[in-house]
Structure formats: structure tokens, C-alpha cells
Amino acid sequence: MTDFSASPDLQDPTTHAGFVAIVGKPNVGKSTLLNAFLGTKVAPTSPRPQTTRRGVRGIYTLDNRQLIFVDTPGLHKPKDALGKYMNSEVHSALSDVDAVVWVVDLRHPPTDEDRLVANSVRDLPKPLFLVGNKTDAAKYPEEAMKLYGALLEGRGSDLPVSETMLSAQNSVNAVATLREQLLEVLPENPFFFPQGAASDQSREMWAAEIIREEAMKKLRDELPYAVATRVNRWTEREDGLQRIEGEIIVEKNAHKGMVIGAGGKQLREIGQAARKQLEVFLNHKVYLGLEVIVIPGWREDEEALRELGYE
């Protein structure tokens, strides 16, 4: 079972440890890259933009060095209070980290959202790593990479940019090489987390994100973006069965019916898919109970956002 404990454990001061922000516009593969860095799944992934809503921290420890990756939401032009919160997570991460990984989608030239990211990272006095993703599906990946690099022109000569292009053929080796480069730029610090910790998330938050990931895969149109999830109860029986009780939160009664589906079919499919993921990572049988509840306009309600963990 993945260890999600994260109580601080200060170690020998000769160790090196630091934080690395993974940034980029929505849906460029930031969470997938985080999971690849760690070799385990701590962040939800889906083909839909804005799957990541809060800064998820993943921890990689090797010998006397510890990397704490911060997977940030996609930087975008917000439409509601939730979107503003997500952008604030990005800017907060950038202010506190020791290095930055900027992930870009080489299938397309830079967009206004990419320029937002470039403007946020260009002048940071921190090591910057530009990662070109989705190379296999790009017609002209090298040309696209040059366009993204050009957005960083004006960065001082004392602030070099390291570039990496990921493809299906080189993904494993390229990720390992990039991780080694990040390990080398860590400042001298005591460890921030105990060895063996994979994330600072509680197990309840991690499970809630798995449920939301599967909901986003199943639901259509704009509905996935009006969905939140939480786990209210988690108990373990003597035989190892994990009993998890969760909620899917929507904004309207009409949305509730869409999530449940005819005869409960949609909700069952979401629950079954989430349960299978949980069983793989927990290495235990899981009973997952899901209820759909309505919190009107929760994305614009700051109190509701806080209750759902967006604070």
C-alpha cells in the first residue's frame, strides 16, 4: 500500500531537499508527468482540462536527497471563484519553490494561456526546465519547442533554461534524466517528509480525487466541471476490507439525476471504476459507497469551497 503519511521528519542537515512546481496551461500532462516522476499515482488524470484543482504534492526520496513535486492546476482565465482559487494555487506554488518545470503541448503553437504561464515563470530566479510533451502526436515538434522557448527570451544569461522533449520512445529515460537534473539543483536542507512518504495528501483526499477522476471520464459536456467529491468515512475491517463512504457534489438537482443516470447506471459505473483503481493501489478489497448531493452554486460560494477543501 502506498504510504500517504506526511508528518515532518527533520533529518541530518547535510541532506538536500526542495520543492519543484510543475506548471502549464490546462491539459498538457502535468499530473501524468508527476506520477511518472514518482512511479506511482498520487494525482488524478483525465483527458479533460482542469482535472487538477489544488496543488498536489508528490515526494521522491533518493539517498540523501528529497524532491517535493507540486502539481499545480492549469493556469487559465478564471470564470468563477473556483477558477480564481486554482490560479492562486499556481502563483502560491511559484513563490515558494526551488525549481520550476513548465510543461507544454507540442501539438500546438503557444496560446494566450501559455503566454500567461511564460509571463509567470520568465523572470523567476530559479532553475527552469521546459518540457515539451505529446511529441508523438505533433507534426513539427522541434519548431513548436522553439516557439515556446522564444516566450522566455529576456530571461537573464545567469538563469538558463533546460529543455526536454518527451515521446513514447524516450519517455522513461527522459523522465529519469530530468529527475536526476532536478535532484542536482536541490538546496541543502533537512528532509521535509519521512522516507517512504509518497504524498502529503490524506488518504481520504486521495480517494476523493480518484472518484472525481472517474466521474470526469464518464460525464459529458460542462457537467464534470460542476462536480466535486469528498470522502466522509473510511474504516477497515479485520479481514482487510476497506469501507469507504463518499459523496459526489453537484450544483443543481438536474445535475444530480444526470450523475445517477437511468436506474442508477451512471453512478454504478463511476463507483465501479473508482473501486477498481482503489483496490489496485491499496492492494485490498474495497467497498465504495457513493451518494450524490446538491450544494447550489458551490463553485461561486467561498464557504462551500472551504468546506470542500479548496482553501
Curated annotation (Swiss-Prot):
Era-type G domain mapped to chain residues: 16-188
Molecular functions (GO terms): GTP binding; GTPase activity; ribosomal small subunit binding; rRNA binding; small ribosomal subunit rRNA binding
Membrane among keywords: yes
Top-level taxon of origin: Bacteria
Residue segments, region G1: 24-31
GO biological process terms held by the UniProt record: ribosomal small subunit assembly
Binding of GTP, residues: 24-31, 71-75, 133-136
Region of interest (G3), ranges: 71-74
One GO cellular component, as annotated: cytosol
Recorded topology in the membrane: Peripheral membrane protein
Annotated spans, G4: 133-136
Keywords linked to the UniProt accession: Cell membrane, Cytoplasm, GTP-binding, Membrane, Nucleotide-binding, Ribosome biogenesis, RNA-binding, rRNA-binding
Pfam family, one: KH_2
Region (G5): 166-168
PANTHER family: GTPASE ERA (PTHR42698), GTPASE ERA, MITOCHONDRIAL (PTHR42698:SF1)
Functional note: An essential GTPase that binds both GDP and GTP, with rapid nucleotide exchange. Plays a role in 16S rRNA processing and 30S ribosomal subunit biogenesis and possibly also in cell cycle regulation and energy metabolism.
Family: Belongs to the TRAFAC class TrmE-Era-EngA-EngB-Septin-like GTPase superfamily. Era GTPase family.
Name this protein carries in UniProt: GTPase Era
Protein's organism: Deinococcus radiodurans (strain ATCC 13939 / DSM 20539 / JCM 16871 / CCUG 27074 / LMG 4051 / NBRC 15346 / NCIMB 9279 / VKM B-1422 / R1)
